[in-house]
Amino acid sequence: MFGVDHLWLAGNATPPTHKAVDKTALGTARLVPWEHAGTPAAAAAAVREQGLRLVAVELTADAVPLHEAPLDGDVCLAVGGEDHGCSPALLAAADAVAYIPQIGRVGSLNVAVATAIALAEARRRDWTT
């Protein structure tokens, strides 16, 4: 849908082979190659071995708005879990950290929604340049 070539999982991430994921994804999970890299640091290293820039999507003090993040070229977006977000190790390994600007009383988004917004922004840039 957004041109995702690979999925790296780390920590206690639920794999695409889990029956609940397969049901939600309506079978599309099998279309994107994936691997469980172990720790967030190992996942970051695997991303770097592929020559990708690592951009974490997380609300931190030093994060830049998503529309200003370095999403051009070959990039890997890192998102954390629903409860705890990106780990400190992953944030430290990231080339940049970006947040999704929001208006309203709630300052967080479901991880699937946040991922879709970040992927759409990355693709929008490719399509408009």
Predicted ranges, named:
Residues 1-129:
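Post-transcriptional modification and biogenesis factors for structured RNAs
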